[in-house]
Amino acid sequence: MSMIPISNRRRLSPGDRIWEPFELMNTFLDFPSPALFLSHHFPSLSREIFPQTSSSTVNTQLNWTETPTAHVFKAYLPGVDQDEVIAFVDEEGYLQICTGDNKFMSRFKLPNNALTDQVTAWMEDEFLVVFVEKDASSSPPQLPEIEENRNVRVVEITGDDD
């Protein structure tokens, strides 16, 4: 359990540090971090390797559901216009959804029963909906049949009724 001081000050001075009992067991306390080393000695290189992602990405949620007739992808893309979104299926069967300014990108390997030439996409409010048809001739996976004689033994439970 760790305790966090609550005060009006933003940072604690070194003398105000709270003692953490597990700090003594931390073997990586003096271990140099490559990110800190790069940012201190090579600031331009560290910006390329560790880009600031706070305002340059879209905070999105994506859902993939499978219905009996199609695969449906729904992505919440706040602040993204319909003209900025690109959705396509490549020759390897991957569905790629991205924005033109690369603030969002996601790839999905479509199953073999997906008809990659029958893909439709549209925007509803801030939601992108991608609809990929399924092959109707492919049957759903068969569940194993349950045997009627399963070697079941009935055990009588006896005891004292108090």
UniProtKB/Swiss-Prot annotation:
Localization per record: Cytoplasm
Q: Carries keyword Nuclease?
A: no
- Please state the gene responsible for encoding this protein: HSP18.5
Q: Which residues form a coiled coil?
A: none
What superkingdom heads the lineage?
A: Eukaryota
Q: How does it assemble?
A: May form oligomeric structures.
One GO BP annotation of this record: response to oxidative stress
| Similarity annotation | Belongs to the small heat shock protein (HSP20) family.
Q: Where is the sHSP domain?
A: 53-149
The organism encoding this protein is Arabidopsis thaliana
Q: Which UniProt keywords apply?
A: Cytoplasm, Stress response
Q: Which Gene3D superfamilies match?
A: 2.60.40.790
Name any GO cellular component annotation: cytoplasm
**Full protein name:** 18.5 kDa class IV heat shock protein
